[in-house]
Amino acid sequence: MKNKHPLSKDELQLFRESVVDAKKLRQDTIVHRKPKPKTKQIAPQRLLQEQVDASHYFSDEYQPQLEEEGPTRYVRPGYSAFELKKLRRGDYSPELFLDLHGLTQMQAKQELGALIAACRREHVHCACVMHGHGKHILKQQTPLWLAQHPDVLVFHQAPKEWGGTAAILLLVELAE
């Protein structure tokens, strides 16, 4: 393959002489994330089963003890409260997002179950659930459901850039 603009030896020598004192710039502004492993296509029936299995944990009768004052937050018993602080101050950024606007409670439970299953399957540690304000039904129920799931380690009301009082950031326990 021929070069479109071949340089003569004199031109190459002139270029090398002109850049001999150049210093390499240090790149410190862009964070390179690790490439995600390619995920296999999953059969729709298996996805549906994952949704059903994961939503099995969500009960409307059980009311976990959540703090009523301040922002919505939860730390699984036996887990470090420092992770909650790191989540609150933005050390984690969500990689998966779920928007529950316009869904019924049953649909929302299934979608939450699917989100948690997807996080575990794709090795995503942090996710964001946008429940919205609306009639406050999903806003009240979402934290109660999340606190019941054994794979949810921590959740906290999202900062403004991720939805504020209309969203929750959560950390999911990953399979080894």
Curated annotation (Swiss-Prot):
Assembly and oligomerization: Associates with collided ribosomes, but not with correctly translating polysomes.
Lineage: Bacteria, Pseudomonadati, Pseudomonadota, Gammaproteobacteria, Enterobacterales
Any one GO molecular-function label of the UniProt entry: rRNA binding
PROSITE patterns: SMR
EC number in record: 3.1.-.-
InterPro entries: Smr_dom, Smr_dom_sf, SmrB-like
GO biological process: rescue of stalled ribosome
A Pfam family per the record: Smr
Top class in the EC scheme: hydrolase
Entry protein name: Ribosome rescue factor SmrB
Encoding gene per record: smrB
Superkingdom assignment: Bacteria
Cleavable signal peptide: none
Function: Acts as a ribosome collision sensor. Detects stalled/collided disomes (pairs of ribosomes where the leading ribosome is stalled and a second ribosome has collided with it) and endonucleolytically cleaves mRNA at the 5' boundary of the stalled ribosome. Stalled/collided disomes form a new interface (primarily via the 30S subunits) that binds SmrB. Cleaved mRNA becomes available for tmRNA ligation, leading to ribosomal subunit dissociation and rescue of stalled ribosomes.
Keywords, comma-separated and alphabetical: Endonuclease, Hydrolase, Nuclease, RNA-binding, rRNA-binding
Smr domain segment(s): 98-173
SMART domains in alphabetical order: SMR
Homology family: Belongs to the SmrB family.
